[in-house]
Amino acid sequence: YRALLETLKRDPMHRAAQVQPEIEFALARQAEMATIQNALTAGELPLRVTHNDTKLNNVLLDAKTRKALCVIDLDTVMPGSSLYDFGDSIRFGAATAAEDEKDIFKMEMSLDRFRVFTRGYVRACPGLTAKELELLPMGAKTMTMECGVRFLTDYLDGDHYFAVHRDGQNLDRARTQFKLVADMEKKWDEMRKIVEEEAK
């Protein structure tokens, strides 16, 4: 959020006035997005080795069997929260539309995909603490918001960080991520229930 706030002060491309709804959406959730970091700092969550870019394209698959062989792109590995890896996987894998989809109404979070991934994750990670399990949905929301804020910041700053192939692509990316967050908020109780059911 620091980068967003600094970019808003400068407004180098004079784009802020055009994206007030997106800015307001991001700022309204700023305090909540510190939940996981605050829990880490307070010692309520364990520090774990995390990948920090947990997308399907970072899993090497066998060409014949399509079974996973190993995780790749290890330059992002560092200490962190398991919730970040879980959350980024949900952001990427449970989304119903492409990251830069222009029609944000195509973007939702699939509860079916959320359930399947959650089931696999908690079974593969039997050492997750009760607090980690409780905050799994927050991991998904946090990582999705973080990406949305980063895309919005880059759009406001002139599209220097994320590669763009058309005008407004980073803004579209921000909007899809914010739509995904809004859909998670609508489905929040269901997400929490799924985690409880799959963690039994």
Model-identified regions with their sequence ranges:
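Catalytic activation segment of kinase domains across protein kinase-like and atypical kinase folds
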Residues: 43, 57-98
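Phosphate/dinucleotide-binding and metal-coordinating scaffold of catalytic cores
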Residues: 9-13, 76, 93-94, 100-101, ...
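ATP-dependent phospho-/nucleotidyl transfer catalytic cores
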Residues: 1-51, 56-70, 163-171, 179-182, ...
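A structural signal for short hydrophobic/aromatic patches embedded in well-ordered alpha helices
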Residues: 26, 117, 135-136
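Secondary-structure capping and boundary motifs in well-ordered enzyme cores
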Residues: 46-51, 78, 109-113, 140-145, ...
